[in-house]
């Protein structure tokens, strides 16, 4: 049986087989997996907010924001042998967990997180091979670097793989 490496909120980590990597509690947050299928290494970030400019402090958790988490994850993957040109991405989350009377853009955190992750991945030239984003239900995801499958358990909808 393989060991599961857990990634908390505003957290990230990397794995090699036989380990898998999992995060839970993806509501408006986005879970992003970057993997090198040649080296069989993978990393996951649990991103809470789209832009580090939203942070109020000089010192902040880089794993919390789309614009900084993906750079940090990339450097951790390269440190264990991943090649940037071989990296691919899968992502899930970005739900709209609550309905609001106004159409205030600030309340669309899930959609803004998804857009920020996609923008950053484009900047890094990392293709997104699969995604399961949006909706209004929370998700738990687990990635296996050996099979390259992302298992997604969505509240009230069951499980699927991408």
Curated annotation (Swiss-Prot):
The keyword Hydrolase applies. It comes from the Bacteria. GO terms for molecular function: protein-glutamine glutaminase activity. It catalyses: L-glutaminyl-[protein] + H2O = L-glutamyl-[protein] + NH4(+). Its EC number is 3.5.1.44. InterPro entries: CheD-like_sf, Chemorcpt_Glu_NH3ase_CheD, Cytotoxic_necrot_fac-like_cat. Keywords: Chemotaxis, Hydrolase. Disulfide bonds: none annotated. Pfam families: CheD (PF03975). Gene3D superfamilies: 3.30.1330.200. It is an enzyme of class 3 (hydrolase). GO terms for biological process: chemotaxis. PANTHER family: CHEMORECEPTOR GLUTAMINE DEAMIDASE CHED-RELATED. Deamidates glutamine residues to glutamate on methyl-accepting chemotaxis receptors (MCPs). CheD-mediated MCP deamidation is required for productive communication of the conformational signals of the chemoreceptors to the CheA kinase. Forms a complex with CheC. Belongs to the CheD family. This is Chemoreceptor glutamine deamidase CheD. It comes from Halalkalibacterium halodurans (strain ATCC BAA-125 / DSM 18197 / FERM 7344 / JCM 9153 / C-125) (Bacillus halodurans). The gene is cheD.
């Amino acid at each position: 049986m393989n060991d599961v490496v857990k990634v908390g909120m505003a957290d990230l980590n990397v794995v090699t087989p036989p380990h898998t990597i999992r995060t839970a509690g993806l509501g408006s947050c986005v879970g992003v997996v970057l993997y090198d299928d040649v080296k069989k290494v993978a990393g996951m970030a649990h991103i809470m907010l789209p832009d580090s400019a939203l942070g109020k402090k000089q010192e902040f958790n880089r794993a919390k924001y789309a614009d900084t988490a993906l750079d940090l994850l990339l450097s951790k993957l390269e440190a264990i042998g991943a090649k940037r040109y071989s990296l691919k991405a899968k992502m899930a989350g970005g739900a709209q967990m609550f309905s609001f009377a106004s159409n205030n853009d600030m309340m669309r955190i899930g959609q803004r997180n998804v857009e920020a992750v996609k923008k950053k991945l484009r900047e890094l030239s990392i293709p997104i091979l699969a995604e399961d984003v949006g909706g209004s239900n929370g998700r738990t995801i687990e990635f296996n670097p050996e099979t390259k499958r992302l298992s997604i358990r969505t509240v009230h909808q069951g499980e699927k793989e991408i």
